[in-house]
Amino acid sequence: TKDLEMQKGVPYPRGFKKMPNIVGNSETTAPEHVELALKELIEWYKKNKKKVHPLILALEFHKRYEEIHPFQDGNGRTGRLIMNKILLSSGYQPIIVYKENKLAYFNALAKAREGRTKNYYQFMLEQTKKAYDFLEDTARKY
């Protein structure tokens, strides 16, 4: 809607990022390469959809998407939404990263960018357990 087109009185940017952005201390894909990088990511997904376990597929897609960081804002939310769509489509529960774990989430992604994906996978699986425990506790109350 038109209301969403403004953010703090400034027109909200549309489309892919126009300026470089940095996540933590890591550079992301340059604006002029975003479209190609996303096409390659989609091709990677299609190629691996039937070969790779859905959990690994979703986590790896999310990691790669965040490395591209195609928009000026909202990349984390969008990336987690896509990751959870992949998980839900395969019968797995979504992964919720709670606000209090935001810094640890950024650190896990940074380590993954350095090639230490085990830390990232472990962190995300811990979030899955927390979400499951929350759902289980909530269900018991009713």
Regions found by a protein language model. Name each.
Residues 1-73, 77-142:
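FIC/Doc superfamily catalytic core
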